[in-house]
């Protein structure tokens, strides 16, 4: 039995308000988006491309030997952007699994990118994602940290029941910090982008709730650490230090 073909897509745009021009910010002489691209390539799990509507991002990626697919500028989410990119790159529909990797994860480890595929070994799973255990009260109560509430299936694997910015679940026991990395079965991505925004998605401002409210199954692999995203100048300096610059 051959392994399903996997495509890693990195959606990127220049519209960040807290950190303008984020994908092209310099880390050791290389744009941040290129660091993410290189880590995805190092995972060695399939073809990798950056999906963008911005010529400057495309030029930077191509200059460093990466693949780019240009998309429309009016997409409401990264999921919609990668869906368009998938259709463009694979009209023959050979790709079975699509990974959505955020372009602001320059410190993500290649093995974490590969780990997101593991929950899809169960054919009942529509979407896979990752989380890491929370170890501080500050992280637990921070609304910018998305928590996943899930039912344990086995060691290091949960079935997601809910995602929230609140402190949850209540009581003793571990809480988990959701990592915004997704692996979709192709049919699941196509269904997801066909659905309208759901009530809880709009309330929590978390698009993965659209899938749960539609009855789709999301399983969550537990990893040992959270790759820190870059949203502020302080985050950028942290990423530079982590990468030795």
From Swiss-Prot:
GO terms for cellular component: cytosol. Pathway: Nucleotide-sugar biosynthesis; CMP-3-deoxy-D-manno-octulosonate biosynthesis; CMP-3-deoxy-D-manno-octulosonate from 3-deoxy-D-manno-octulosonate and CTP: step 1/1; Bacterial outer membrane biogenesis; lipopolysaccharide biosynthesis. InterPro entries: Cytidylyl_trans, KdsB, Nucleotide-diphossugar_trans. It catalyses: 3-deoxy-alpha-D-manno-oct-2-ulosonate + CTP = CMP-3-deoxy-beta-D-manno-octulosonate + diphosphate. Its main location: cytoplasm. The keyword Nucleotidyltransferase applies. Signal peptide: none annotated. One of its GO terms (molecular function) is 3-deoxy-manno-octulosonate cytidylyltransferase activity. Keywords: Cytoplasm, Lipopolysaccharide biosynthesis, Nucleotidyltransferase, Transferase. It is found in: Cytoplasm. It comes from Rhodopseudomonas palustris (strain BisB5). It holds the Pfam family CTP_transf_3. GO terms for biological process: CMP-keto-3-deoxy-D-manno-octulosonic acid biosynthetic process; lipopolysaccharide biosynthetic process. It comes from the Bacteria. This is 3-deoxy-manno-octulosonate cytidylyltransferase. It is an enzyme of class 2 (transferase). Its EC number is 2.7.7.38. Activates KDO (a required 8-carbon sugar) for incorporation into bacterial lipopolysaccharide in Gram-negative bacteria. Belongs to the KdsB family.
